[in-house]
Each structure stands twice: as structure tokens, then as C-alpha cells.
Amino acid sequence: MSKVAVVTRTHNRPLFLARVLKTVAEQTFSDYVHLIVNDAGSPDAVRAAVAQLPAAAQSRVEVINNEVSHGREAAVNPGFSRAGEMGVTYVAVLDDDDSWEADFLTDCVAWLDSKPDYVGVASRTTLVYEEINREGSAVVELRRGPLAPDKHTVALEDILQVNWVPPVSLLFRAETLPKLTGWREDLPVLSDWDFFLRMLLLGPVGFIDSPLANWHHRANAVGDDGNSVVVAAQDHNDFHAIIRDQALREALTCTASPSTQPDLKTLAQPLLLAHYAKALREENERLTQQLKELQLQQRERNEEIVRYFDEKTQRLSAQLGEVGESVLLLHERMNSMGFKARWRRLFHRG
């Protein structure tokens, strides 16, 4: 029995599938099973990608073929079900277009082994911006940087506002799956946020402040090659509101089915408060930015006024200097022509 199940959903993305198979095969932790959920894609393409791995890595891969796709979010659940059947201790969701550093599983497993009261642990995530070359034969990295560099702990308060812990960064206990019942299949996006919110109701999630997870983004990719956070950006905005609305409706009407499982109705008020807190913070940031721009404009205007009067003063000083020189010159010329003596004689007669 493997200790960790890594669930990867894929659909006709052989370029990414080859990369994710490689990143898992290169983990320094080897007590895992890699569950590939082929969501109604080409089985031959998946087999070909797996065949490129060393024999030891191939033996740790199991492919689950969905004949019919029930949606991107639903594709995770067959992997969860299989992980439960296998009796693993920990589970991770690693999408086919993301990657890990070699010590991700080693460090996360060690952390959870030492913290039995925690339901999961997340590592710091690196945002990797990339594009597919024109030939479609390679992925080219453009730049990278840390995701949420100001965060150093996983707090429900923060996740209520926005999920800065993507699936690629999270390892959680398999024993939570019966209570969480997987990702919601009625949502086209944000099932990971909904799942993570409900997980945080079960217990705390730790944080490893080392960049062990890589979340890959392709701003210009479309179709199968795109990221949902990019190609379905409007859906993310819409369903963020829909999830909050559902939680509030369940809380107000008590329509949620009674059970011991965590559900969103318990988060209705916190979700709304977090949403408005986020809106207020963004408005404050907008107003602060406007104030900075106004202050900059005023400073530039003041500098223009100072420059204007400096130039005027310099011109006046120059003109006065010219007048002074003219007066001196006139005085010298008058002296040279005897005007001073004549003036004295004229004044003396008077």
C-alpha cells in the first residue's frame, strides 16, 4: 500500500502530461501512487506518455479512463475514490500543467507526520508564466515569481476572501475525504476553493515557507492548453459570488441536508463579511492610489510654479543687471563729456 496518492486530471494535453509525469517521477519521496484521470481523452496518448518513464516510475502510475467527461472539476473525484480504496494516508491534487520541486512530497509528508492535529499542509507557491511555442512542441518559460509573498500562515480568514493556496501546493489527509465528499461537480470552476473552505472547517492547515510548488500560467493560451483561471476568468468572478450566495441561502432557509459533514451554510456570514472586507480593502487601495496620484500631480504643479517664478526672477535679475550696466555706462560717458563739472557750475549759480 502506498502512503501518498497523487491525483492528476488530464484531457488531451500530452505536452503537459509528459512534464507532470516527469516531475512526480523525480520526487525524492517514492512511496506514492500516481493516479492519472484521463477525462475522456485519448488513452493511447496517455499510454505513450507513461511509457516514456523509467520502469520504476511506470510501476507507480495507474490510469483511470473516463469514457465520458463530466467536467473539469468532476474529473478529480475518480482519483479521490481510488485513493480511498487503496487506503493511502495522504492525497495531493497535481494538475497536468503544474509541477513540483523534487522535495515537495518529502517535506510535506514529514511535516504532516509530525503534526497529527493538522488536516493538511501547504507549501509556498511559485507563479510560473509560460507560453507554448508556435510549433506546439515545447513550453517556454517567460518569468516567475512568488505567489502571495506576504502570507506566512494558512488562515481561514484569508481563504474566505480569496484562495491563495492552489491545489498544487497542498497535501492533505486521506481520512478527510469521506467527510468532504470530493470536489463539487456542479461547479465549472472554484471547486478547489469550496473544497478547501470545507477542509479548513475540519482542522488547521500548516504552511511550509519554502517554494516547493509551481503554479503554471499561460496568459495567451486558449482551449485545452489554457488555464481555467485565465480562459475562464469571468466564471471565477461569477461563481465566487454564486458560492457565497448559496451559503447565505442555506443559512437563512436551513435547506442544507443535516449531516456531520462540513457544509457552506456555517460559513455564510464569514463569507459575506470577508467579501465586503475585501471590497473595502480594494476600495481603500484604489482611493490611496488616487491620493498618491493627486499628491504627485500637486507636487509636479508646485514644481512648475517654482520653476516659473525662478525663471521670471532670473529674467528680471538679468534685465536689472542690464539696466545697471547701462546706467553705469551712461554715468561714465557723462563724466567723460564734462557733464559733471557743468552741472556743478549750473547748480552753483542757482
Language-model regions, residue ranges each:
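Nucleotide-sugar donor-binding/catalytic module of glycosyltransferases
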Residues: M1-N237
